[in-house]
Amino acid sequence: MDNKTFEEIVVLWQADKKQYVKRSTYSAYSLLIANHLLPAFAGVNDVTEILVQDFVFTKLQQGLSQKSIKDILIVLKMILRYGVKQGYLEHREIDVKFPTERERQEVEVLSRNNQKRIMEYVQSHFTFMNLGIYICLCAGLRIGEV
């Protein structure tokens, strides 16, 4: 077996995957890898269930949603499967558990009065940044969509 670090396997996986997925999908994978997977597993030779479980708890503590973490884990498992298939890693089952949600986070929404005040301010103090804020308010965009 040709042992490689997680980072080396990622580079090979990306080169292989690029041929088969759309550019937007490849970009999404690359973003998840750069922002989450490489900082956590870059120098690791053996990605274990314990490491992945710790990674999940860390991401939850940082405020990522379970859905976002599950999306990251899908990419991680694709990379690990590729590593096994190519003979760089031994097959290993990784069963990650998520804690039950005890309390729902309250979504903060602007009141009509506050929205009106912001829109009046933006209209009287024009800048291109304020124009962007105005458009977002009028279109109903959420913070994560901006």
Where is each model-derived feature located?
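N-terminal core-binding DNA-recognition domain of tyrosine site-specific recombinases/integrases
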Residues: 2-4, 14-82, 86-88, 104
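N-terminal intrinsically disordered, low-complexity tails enriched in polar/charged
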Residues: 1-2, 139
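Basic, Lys/Arg- and aromatic-enriched nucleic-acid-binding interface segment
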Residues: 70, 85, 89-91, 95-143
